[in-house]
From Swiss-Prot:
GO terms for biological process: 'de novo' pyrimidine nucleobase biosynthetic process; 'de novo' UMP biosynthetic process. This is Orotidine 5'-phosphate decarboxylase. GO terms for molecular function: orotidine-5'-phosphate decarboxylase activity. Belongs to the OMP decarboxylase family. Type 1 subfamily. Homodimer. Disulfide bonds: none annotated. It catalyses: orotidine 5'-phosphate + H(+) = UMP + CO2. Catalyzes the decarboxylation of orotidine 5'-monophosphate (OMP) to uridine 5'-monophosphate (UMP).
Length: 233
């Protein structure tokens, strides 16, 4: 999934179908999140797969290890390319998630598994006040990244602002999947740690997730091509 990942932040398959139709059969990397998956169920994944798109299923599992393991066995059977959990669920939970994917994968190759460190909507002040974390935001992200690697996962979800430090700590093969990407002309909305595609590339992101800059654009194809151009600059 080296192409920019488009966040399909829609509620219905009809909206998804109309959006994807604009790309004239091009094979894309897309993210199916909670809104779309919970509104339509697993069938939405199969419909998108039939169009030859790579899928990041973004459900951010966070529960006791046995529950997450069982859930991942089921998700693995969907044939998606990448899934995620919350790193704050702990090392045992993340290990259980990986084991579930390995059991459930029918192709012999499990989906990539990454863990959310801190949401890009979270500021350092929010984290320290609401989560009672005394460390800095960067220290928290690096701690979760190290825990994720110890659990045998493939990488993390992080903001681009922490990506280079994670790369130095955990190696270049450890994925740094970055949401909160906007074209320079777009509003940041509810996300705080936000950068442009070109900036994300220059400071260490391995993959980027782009939603509103593409899906809400007057010309989504042109916006996607601009993101792609900046990402590959």
């Amino acid at each position: 999934m080296n192409k920019p990942i488009i966040a399909l932040d829609f509620q219905t398959y009809q909206e998804v179908e109309a959006f994807l139709a604009q790309f004239s059969g091009e094979s894309l990397s897309v993210k199916v999140g909670m809104e779309l998956f919970y509104s339509n169920g697993p069938a939405i994944v199969e419909k998108i797969k039939q169009q030859n798109h790579a899928i990041f299923l973004d459900l951010k599992l966070h529960d006791i290890p046995n529950t997450v393991k069982s859930a991942m066995i089921g998700l693995a059977k969907l044939g998606v390319d990448m899934v995620n959990v919350h790193a704050s669920g702990g090392k045992k939970m993340m290990e259980a998630a990986r084991e579930g994917l390995e059991i459930g994968s029918t192709s012999g190759k499990r989906p990539k598994l990454i863990a959310v460190t801190q949401l890009t909507s979270t500021s350092e002040t929010d984290m320290q006040k609401e989560q009672l974390v005394k460390a800095s935001l960067l220290e928290s992200v690096l701690h979760y990244s190290d825990l994720t690697k110890q659990a045998g996962l493939d990488g993390v979800v992080c903001s681009a602002l922490e990506a280079d430090e994670i790369k130095l700590q955990n190696g270049s093969d450890f994925l740094r999947v970055t949401p909160g990407i906007r074209l320079a002309s777009d509003a940041t909305d509810d996300q705080i740690r936000v950068v442009t595609p070109e900036k994300a590339r220059s400071i260490g992101s391995s993959n980027i997730v782009v939603g509103r800059s593409i899906t809400r654009a007057n010309d989504p194809v042109a916006a996607y091509n601009q993101v792609l151009k900046e990402w590959n600059a």
